[in-house]
Amino acid sequence: MGLDYLMVHVKYNLPPALLLTILYKPFFTRLEVHKIVLLCTIAVVWTIPWDSYLIRTRIWSYPADSVLGQTLFQIPLEEVFFFIIQTYNTSLLYIIFNKRLVLPSYLSGPTKPLAQGLFGPITHRTQRDLGTLFFTGILILGISFIYIGGEYMYLGLILSWVSPILVMQWVLMYRFLLALPPASVWVPIALPTLYLWVVDTLALRRGTWVIESGTKVDIQLWEGLEIEEALFFLVTNVMVVFGIAAMHNAAALFEYKAFISTTAMGDTPSIYQLITLFLTSSRLYDTNVLQEMSQAVTLLKQKSQSMYLGSAMFEGQLRLDLIALYSFCRKADDLIDDAPDRETAKYWIEQCEKALELRFKLKETALDDTEAYQLLTKSIPQPLHAAAHLLPASRLPKEPLSCLLQGFEIDLKFDFEKGSFPIATEHDLEVYAYHVAGTVASLLLELVFRHHPVSISEAERLRVISAGEVMGRALQYTNIARDITRDAEIGRVYIPSSWLAEEGLTPSMVISHPRNSKLIPLRRRILEKADKCYCETQEAISKLPSNVQGPVRATVTAYMEIGQVIRENETKIWNGKLKVSRWRRFKRAWLAML
């Protein structure tokens, strides 16, 4: 009896597990826990017969003075725990690296060919066949090594044990796997593999476990690490990552089918539902929906990293609906702001309103309805096709979106040459902030209540939505404080003229000299107004469904951190768009999710 193997876990395997768990705990979802539990169970069930055979045939052994002595099918319990802890660590690392991804956008496979063949791009079918051939070749090689026996036995047992799983995983999800960003797959494989190579080297040198001579090829990756051991940890981590990726593929299928429907599916799917869907569902998708979804995600990443990372804390259909809502609002804003003249901007407002009218008339048709899609796209300009089509009209009221367009009309009233500046008073500022941000916040809460109904009165629900409008204004005030210089460059001043007059300034003076030090106290005043709105709405968040309180609070808190960064850099933020570091955003979101 000994503690050597147990101490390997205490020193090397448990610390990263605890660290990753603590870092990720506020963001854990019930479905993610179920995925990891299932994968750990599969790992134990699949590995026990194989490992038991290795021990019984003396390919692998454990000195009596390095283990506690309790076994399961002759496998030390410390070894069984290794199956669990390795699977847990690798799975959790993969989940963390892929939390930000919007999974359905990867369902159709790579958007660009991965390689060129002799006769042109390699098709998806060819990619599938090549991968299947590769993993089948590994199986044949493993069986051959077992047949040869002797020093090739352990190597053959590893290859023949792992390859059937890899073949199955590849055939079922090769498109999804190839579409994922390469780093999101290979980093969660490489990091734990390298780490376990080091741990295994130390254990082999100490004699904690032993590969019997005559069953290994006696090639070492480096001193103390047998090539079989290096291969074992590599292929097992590949299996784990492919396994959790397969569950993500199943979740992506569920989210896609929910998103294209006209109903709200707030409940988290069970593992059984995901497995059934994964094994039985057709792999035919509406390419328009998937392309538009990818465009919406790209737009969100480019325009607002805070909102992109914040969206990752929401789950399933709700997250997709929020991204689609943001896509329409952002696209409309960009078309109007980037218009070369006022008439073109007015044209785009009219077209946005037209797109809304038509989309809400078609709200009871699914997104993959070809006839409805053609009717919509024939009636509105091409730049609005994707944003209007994805809009979850069946789960939203139209009025706030029309109010948003009215806010854009306020922007058109700015005219430096004529001395026209519509934000004359603090009330004007509040009205503007409501139109361009309060409306969007209210739509977010409408989606929340559609997906996750709660037992509150209609009056209470409306009060919470009203508080959401105030929160939206807080975010807009923060934007205004941040973008004084950038807004002045396009002839806009959102600081009320009455406030400017108190400092002896006019809107025209701000446009001419947007870095005037007299603007610093006014910027503080706007931030104070933002903070006041933020504080007023905190109690209302507790009335939201429990599973979205954390994500809403974290998203808003992380965004409001912009205001704190502005205060810390009052004289240094005139040039360019202020950025909040990822670590700082993560810290604020982590604390808010607790």
Swiss-Prot record:
Q: Which Pfam families match?
A: SQS_PSY
> Can you quote a single GO CC term?
membrane
Annotated membrane-spanning segments are: 3-23, 35-55, 77-97, 130-150, 153-173, 176-196, 227-247
This entry's Gene Ontology molecular function terms read: geranylgeranyl diphosphate synthase activity; intramolecular lyase activity; lycopene beta cyclase activity; squalene synthase [NAD(P)H] activity
The chemistry this enzyme catalyses reads:
all-trans-lycopene = gamma-carotene; gamma-carotene = all-trans-beta-carotene; 2 (2E,6E,10E)-geranylgeranyl diphosphate = 15-cis-phytoene + 2 diphosphate
> Species name for this entry?
Arthroderma gypseum (strain ATCC MYA-4604 / CBS 118893) (Microsporum gypseum)
The top of its lineage is: Eukaryota, Fungi, Dikarya, Ascomycota, Pezizomycotina
Descriptive protein name: Bifunctional lycopene cyclase/phytoene synthase
One example of a Gene Ontology biological process annotation: carotenoid biosynthetic process
- Residue ranges of the region described as Lycopene beta-cyclase: 1-249
